[in-house]
Amino acid sequence: MLGVEYLLKMQYKNGGFPQYFPERKAEAYSSQITFNDNAMVNALKMLRDVAVENGRFQLMGVEKGLRKKCQVAYERGLQCVLDCQIRVDEQGRVLEYGTEAWKEGHRTVWCQQHDKVTLAPVKARAYELPSYSGMGETCGILELLMDVENPSEEVSEAVRCGVEWLESHVMKNVMLERFTNEEGKKDVRLLEREGAEPLWARFYDLEHAEPMFCDRSGVPRKKLSEVDYERRNGYTWVGNDPQKVIDRYRGTK
């Protein structure tokens, strides 16, 4: 159970989890609340499962005291997830966490990373800018929330708003093609294709909620073709994972 104790130690008071613990000074983003690669989601799943008396860890003889600590940490983390969900006003402008406007704002989805204090969307690596997460981390978060037994009204609203946001930001009639470019290298590009399966971008800009791409220059691009070869082919920019989440949600209604 040393790993569980480690998770309990690294959790912030607001319920968030950093990417690394202890913090890596050379990487400023390592201490931010991290949903990237499902880091926080997986941590919460572990705490949730340990907290269950007759769960998958029962044969390990988890002490009651530790189970209780895990339950408290899980609930605190779940609240942090809800608090990090980006909220906007009627004009689609991102609202600051904790303000009166934020309390009345409309829930959307999440960023890959959020500030460990303000909970605002923040950047990580040069090509991971503050943004709405479409095909990536938002999916894992929504699945975590849909797994909550006897969900509160807040959890239910968070899921509903997240799914609706994904449904309204699908990239229609677009397909990802893998091809050999003029230099004889394997490459990727987005093409218009009538009737193509729905796709979602990994990132959507915070101003207009439109698909956004980037490379190590840190300059946001509107088109994948504008990203340099190395990052264009070295990162997953689009995908259809949200469809599974949408289908699961709609199938339970």
Model regions and ranges:
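Active-site cradle of extracellular carbohydrate-active enzymes
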Residues: 2-40, 47, 61-131
